[in-house]
Regions:
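Sec-dependent signal peptide recognition
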Residues: 3-10
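Peptidyl-prolyl cis-trans isomerase
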Residues: 21-37, 43-431
């Protein structure tokens, strides 16, 4: 009978402590105007195990003070921080973290086909010499100010046709159409070249070609290429043998351009899935107007913010049935990465920056839609932590710039008084 009573007592005691633990589970450590700091806030930042370690230490009050000040500034940042663009900074932190999750997902799920590794392994054992003609345009890296992308593509097709119909030889085509003097002096000859030295689009085509073959137009960042394969040579280099394992590692590290191609392709697919269109001719026109208005400032070029001075309101792109003029991109630049500081010395950089911003925007929308792939709660907790830290640092810097004699403790004491801060200095009972 005594044993039964003892068991019942322990059961009641267990239930009692469990109830107390639950009721004390979100203990309030501090209160302030319109807010409070609870155990849940600490768990969100540090995790449950680390919180117990912190709360059992002699300096736990310092941790609570640090966090409650960050929470006050986060909750009242619109009143405390003078910067009118602070909302953009907060949004940028959120966007950048979501994009990081997407990129991590892509990289972690990138699987290499054995045929790719075999192709590179074989390609590294040969060198190619080619004869190359590049037709440039305003949006290519090698810039031609008087030619649109569409015009360049038309010219490239015409060159290929004239060569194939034997109206001109390839050598004659080089003398007529090659734009760069030093390349013209070499009769358009490039090489011998090892695999990986040229843009990926060219590498892949060249190393699948045979001597005498004429290929093109192939688009790269330099323009449209028409090339003739002149010679293929074998490389007798023991270092290039049996490299399949290291090649796989190098590809996943970004070499050869396969990883970039994969992530760009995914971003392009998401962009189109959301009804995305990019209007190349309008971007070209915007650049020409900006250039004609003298917005180019040496040596930096044209800033993204100065593009609103063009008064060019035609849509540069479209997504989710929304037409996007340059004002949309300027607004997004404030909320994405470091685009807010973008300057363009060539139309090539303008075009690619706008394209990158559209891809980022699409990737973030894709993140928001995929609640099963991504842990949204965990991501949002991390975003909030980074936003709190950023706002705290911004506020402290602002106050010290106003009065360089202020110390951290003085600034925070003023904050405590302003928002009626009360901290519970009793050691909390651990759960």
């Amino acid at each position: 009978m005594k044993n039964k009573l003892t068991i019942i007592f322990f059961i009641i005691l267990t239930i009692f402590f469990h109830h107390c633990s639950k009721s004390d589970g979100d203990k309030i450590f501090a209160k302030y105007a319109d807010g409070q700091l609870t155990r849940s806030d600490l768990v969100d930042r540090f995790g449950g195990k680390k919180v117990n370690t912190i709360l059992s230490s002699g300096s736990y009050l310092n941790t609570i003070q640090d966090l409650v000040y960050k929470k006050i500034i986060f909750d009242h940042h619109s009143d405390l921080i003078d910067n009118e663009y602070i909302k953009n900074d907060i949004q940028r932190i959120s966007n950048d973290q979501k994009l990081k999750r997407v990129l991590d997902y892509l990289v972690n799920n990138y699987s290499l086909n054995d045929s790719i590794i075999s192709f590179i392994s074989t390609a590294e054992l040969s060198k190619y010499t080619i004869q190359d003609i590049v037709v440039t345009h305003r949006l290519s890296y090698s810039q031609h100010k008087d030619r649109s992308k569409k015009e360049a593509h038309t010219i490239a097709n015409r060159i290929k046709e004239r060569i194939e119909t034997q109206q001109i030889t390839f050598d004659e085509a080089v003398s007529i159409y090659v734009e760069h003097p030093s390349i013209k002096l070499r009769n358009g000859i490039l090489g011998p070249l090892r695999y990986g030295k040229l843009p990926k689009e060219l590498n892949d085509v060249i190393w699948q070609s045979s001597p005498g073959q004429i290929i093109g137009p192939v688009e790269t960042k330099f323009g449209y290429h028409i090339f003739r394969t002149v010679k293929r040579e074998n490389i007798d280099d023991p270092k290039q043998q049996n490299r399949k394992k290291s090649i796989k590692k190098e590809i996943k590290g970004g070499r050869y351009g396969f990883l970039d191609e994969y992530t760009d392709l995914q971003a392009e697919q998401w962009f189109h899935a959301f009804g995305g269109e990019i209007h190349v001719d309008e971007i070209d026109t915007l650049w020409q107007i900006a250039d004609s208005l003298g917005l180019f400032v040496t040596p930096n070029g044209i800033s993204i913010h100065s593009l609103d001075k063009t008064n060019y309101n035609s849509p540069l792109a479209k997504i989710n049935n929304q037409n996007l003029p340059i004002s949309w991109f300027i607004d997004q630049a404030k909320k994405q990465g470091t685009y807010d500081k973008s300057n363009f010395v060539k139309a090539y950089f303008l075009y690619n920056t706008l394209k990158d911003m559209l891809h980022r925007y699409s990737a973030i929308m894709w993140f928001e839609k995929n609640k099963t792939i991504f842990d949204h709660k965990k991501t949002h907790r991390l975003i909030k932590i980074k936003q709190e830290d950023y706002l705290f640092d911004t506020f402290m810097k602002q106050e010290m710039e106003k009065d360089s004699t202020l110390t951290n403790s003085v600034i925070l004491n003023r904050l405590a008084i302003q928002y009626d801060l009360e901290i519970n200095d009793h050691l909390p009972q651990l759960n």
